[in-house]
């Protein structure tokens, strides 16, 4: 069985990432739970351990794709991409949340708060979170004014201050309200 979870759904900037994880039968992971509740450094160590003891894959959906559709579709697409990349096909994939990807030959079961209930979903949550956080840290080096190395693209006060002062980048999600409002106000200013 595989566990699948996505991260970055509520961010104002950056892609959505998902991971699909099939844990080795003999693995024992202490302290595994929802990735958002684990300190950053411990998450990195857990991610490395999980990767060594599993079959896993990561899928992502770019900001360009998110801007063309909606965040729910993007989240499901990232999960679908992760599942399709798995080198081993699971009999069933347990998906965190109420929705599962469509048009995929793997049987999917949704589990509300699955990252708190099923170990392979929690493992997927950790791998997805670490992968996306590291991506945003790297991207933040090119755009230091938004402090993505600390907020990872979420709508923190620092990020919102950066948006107000410097405007948006191509990595911001144009349909998300704070970004959309900035675009509208800029349009009004130029008319």
Which residues are covered by each model-predicted region?
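RNase H-like, Mg2+-dependent phosphodiesterase core
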Residues: 1-191
């Amino acid at each position: 069985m595989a566990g699948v979870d996505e991260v970055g759904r509520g961010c104002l900037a950056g892609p959505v990432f998902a991971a699909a994880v099939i844990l080795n039968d003999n693995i024992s992971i202490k302290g595994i739970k929802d990735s958002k509740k684990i300190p950053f450094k411990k998450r990195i160590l857990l991610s490395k351990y999980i990767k060594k003891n599993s079959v896993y894959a990561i899928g992502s959906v770019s900001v360009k794709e998110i801007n063309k559709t909606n965040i729910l579709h993007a989240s499901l697409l990232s999960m679908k991409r992760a599942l399709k990349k798995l080198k081993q096909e699971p009999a069933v994939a347990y998906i965190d949340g109420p929705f599962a990807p469509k048009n995929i030959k793997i049987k999917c079961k949704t589990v509300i708060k699955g990252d708190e209930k099923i170990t392979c979903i929690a493992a997927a949550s950790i791998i997805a979170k670490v992968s996306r956080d590291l991506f945003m840290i790297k991207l933040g080096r090119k755009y230091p004014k938004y402090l993505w190395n600390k907020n990872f693209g979420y709508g923190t006060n620092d990020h919102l201050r950066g948006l107000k002062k410097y405007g948006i980048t191509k990595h911001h999600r144009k349909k998300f309200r704070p970004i959309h409002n900035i675009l509208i106000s800029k349009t009004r200013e130029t008319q």
